[in-house]
Amino acid sequence: MARRGFSCLLLSTTATDLPVKRRT
């Protein structure tokens, strides 16, 4: 369960981090 939560968090972070870096 912890692994699943980590993957979800990582995916969410990447999804929000990529557009921001690309925008800058």
Swiss-Prot record:
Induction comment: Down-regulated 6 hours following staurosporine (STS) treatment and up-regulated 24 hours following STS treatment. Down-regulated 6 hours following beta-carotene treatment, returning to its basal level 24 hours following beta-carotene treatment.
Cellular component GO terms held in the UniProt record: cytoplasm; extracellular region
Location within or outside the cell: Secreted; Cytoplasm
GO molecular function terms listed in the Swiss-Prot or TrEMBL record: receptor antagonist activity
Chief localization: secreted
InterPro entries named among the record's database cross-references: Humanin
Entry annotated with the keyword Thylakoid: no
A Pfam family this chain is assigned to: Humanin
Keyword annotations from UniProtKB, A to Z: Cytoplasm, Secreted
GO terms, biological process: negative regulation of execution phase of apoptosis
Tissues/organs with expression: Highly expressed in the kidney, heart muscle and testis.
Similarity-based family: Belongs to the humanin family.
PANTHER family: HUMANIN-LIKE 1-RELATED, HUMANIN-LIKE 4
Protein's job: Plays a role as a neuroprotective and antiapoptotic factor.
Name of the protein in question: Humanin-like 9
Organism (species): Homo sapiens (Human)
